[in-house]
Amino acid sequence: MRIRFFLAILALCGSVTAINAQASLKLPETVKVSPAALNAEPICDPKISASWRKAQEIEGVKIRESNLCSPDNPYLIAAAVKGTNNISMATLMETNLSPDAIIKTDDIDGDGDPDRITIKLEVVELNGKTPDFEGVLPTFDIAPGVQPGAWVFAPKTSGMSTENFESIKANSLLRLPSPVIRVEVGDIVQIVLENTHYLPHTIHLHGVDHPFTHSDGHVAGGDGVPQTNEMFLMPGESRVYEFQPRQSGTMLYHCHVQTHTHLAMGLVGMIIVEENRPNNWLQTLNVGGGHVRYPSVAIQEDFDEEFDLHYHAMDKELHEIIQKYNDPRLIARDMNRLYDITDAKEDYFTLNGLSFPYTLRESLVIAEPDQKIKLRVANTASEMVALHTHGHKATITHYDGIEHNPIAQITRDVYALAAAQRLDLTLNTTNDGLHSYGEGIWLFHDHREKGITTNGMNPGGNVSAIVYKKYLNEIGLPMGLGVDISKYFTHEFHARKLPIWQDLDEAGSLGAPGVRTGFDPEIQNTLFNLFGGFIVGILIYLIIAKRQTALATITGVTSKLRSSKGDKANG
């Protein structure tokens, strides 16, 4: 009876094992995500007029051609060059700028350009929580569907913060990064910060020649540091930061209140001091950075083109704080006391405020053979950037605005930028096997591999490209010879819902696996555990229930063994 019982148990276990093995051999079918089910965006923003790409003259400002998919607004460029006080109302109305956003007056040195420059900046929140509905307002995507909360310095604007009454998207002036500011050596510059935010802020002119105090001796509006130089600029207040730079170079400006969070949130931008030249009307603001379509006289003397490249990175945990609360006290508590930057992990990596594929829209370096191109590069992330250029080796000419000894200047293809560091690079497109390998679509990106991801998804991050004009299509996008890039312009890709290799072959061999036809792996494990426990339980039961019989049997066997040994000894 007992033998038959144990045989039945063994047969049952064998059957379960066989069923389980058979189920595990049945691979699920590949399931493809249909293109019709994707939330896809146009590769180029349809709201941007194709006419903006053309070389044109507005208000006497000769604006260069831009072959980018999303070129800068030429009316904004004209306003930045002439000043909002020196243009027509028709031009001003095309910009969203306030009439007093950029004031240019007084040719003090008589060389044909204004020398007294006033720039008004506001503090703006992007992708913050709104009490009006579930969601964030105004929205600014760094990639399709990716909306980290942010704060930026922005030019003083007129009208709505959104594109229009029906939209929740931020108007074109309200974006990452904070705008690039350009002034000339010797200019008397006033940056007026109007704190339109709900927390205190200041401006620190990082690397820019500026006084510790104003001429009247009052310690206010100098270095921007509340602990040593000035009081917090509270909500609703304004402050003037005045300086007259004596040295040219690529510098920074940023908030110096709770710098560990405010700078990371986006309150940092590039400020460039240009060399003094006659008739040197500058593009005072380069909103969004990238191609400089009205370069300075000094740049035109030595270079064919100029590009501003601002690298930044963001910790998702920090940037979600303003998406949880509307109460400034709770935001201040979480940022100042609960958030621990020593545990921070950067998740978003941007170039000029955007991540791939949006970098293809407006942060390409467009080149032609045999050119010299000026690249001004800044890193405002908390970690190093290892910028690598494919197909080219550029020369580092300046560190933090200071020219490196020309004899010792380094030509290489990886350029290391520490936090807050700036480099000036000369990109030579002469096809000599050293400076350039020839025409093509050549990536440039951070070679710390997490820098080319967006919240861990690749490709993403700060990837962009040096693209020769012959490789651009009619709308300003690279004519690549590889995969179709349209899938990267879908929300599903960045939400990890789109298998990136599903279309590599007709069979979809690397697509998403569907539902298994056999047992689910978790069910298999559960069954194994149940039957294993059942068998162990039966064995324990038999040992306990039959312990008397077992002991008698063991005793009998032991007695027989002893008896047998005794007989042998007597024999």
Regions of interest found by a model, annotated:
Residues 193-197, 377-381, 431-432:
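Asparagine-centered strand-capping/turn motif at beta-strand->loop junctions
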Residues 198-201, 208-212, 221-288, 412-506:
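Extracellular/periplasmic metallocenter environments
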Residues 297-395, 406, 417, 423-427:
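Surface-exposed interaction/gating patches
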Residues 7-15:
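Bacterial N-terminal signal peptides
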Residues 22-201, 205, 209-211, 218-221, ...:
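N-terminal, post-signal-peptide metal-ligating segments of extracellular/periplasmic oxidoreductases
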Residues 17-21:
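Sec/Tat signal peptide C-region and signal peptidase I cleavage site
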Residues 380-383, 388-410, 443-450, 461-468:
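Active/binding-pocket-proximal capping segment
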